[in-house]
Every structure is written in C-alpha cells, then in structure tokens.
Amino acid sequence: MPSILVILGWRFYFYANEGNEPIHVHCRKADAEAKFWLDVGGFAVAEAHAYNMSPTDKRVVRRIIFEHFDYIVSEWQKFQRRRDGKGT
C-alpha cells in the first residue's frame, strides 16, 4: 500500500490487490477515508465511497486530487507496471 501524497493530514495511497480496477486513489485522515475514481480523458474525479467524511472534507480531498491529478495518474501507472512486473 504505497503512499504517494500526504497533504493537510490526508494520506493518498493505492492498494496492490484491487485487480483490474480503473485508475483511482484512496485517502485517509484519522478515522475518515474515501476512494475516488479518476477519469483521465475527462479530467474528472468521482467519489466511489466515503466514510466519516464531512462535505468540507470531500471538497478538500477533491481539490487536492485535482491539484495533483497528473502526478497521481503517473504514480498509478508506475505502480501498476511494477506490480505487473513490467518495470518502471
């Protein structure tokens, strides 16, 4: 479960065992957590699920994802290549 960003107390990370799911990122801060899908072609973010997050928390996380969208996508792609044994 590599962490790729820690901003404003939010840790953004991936899981290695999620099969062939589309690009997404998990985030956690204290007892709040969520998963967001990233639509690369449409430069869009959609909430997959959220637990114990206020509307403000969701807005903050979405803003962080948009501000680091290209970086998250790049890290996702590198992570998947390493996981699949295809190098960096």
Show which residues each predicted segment covers.
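A short, structured beta-strand/loop element
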Residues: N17-P55
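C-terminal structural segments of small proteins and small subunits
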Residues: P55-T88
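Negatively charged, low-complexity tracts enriched in Asp/Glu with abundant Ser/Thr
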Residues: M1-F12
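Sequence-level detector for tyrosine residue identity
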Residues: Y13-Y15, Y51, Y71
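Alpha-helical interaction segments
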Residues: I4, Y15, H26, R59, ...
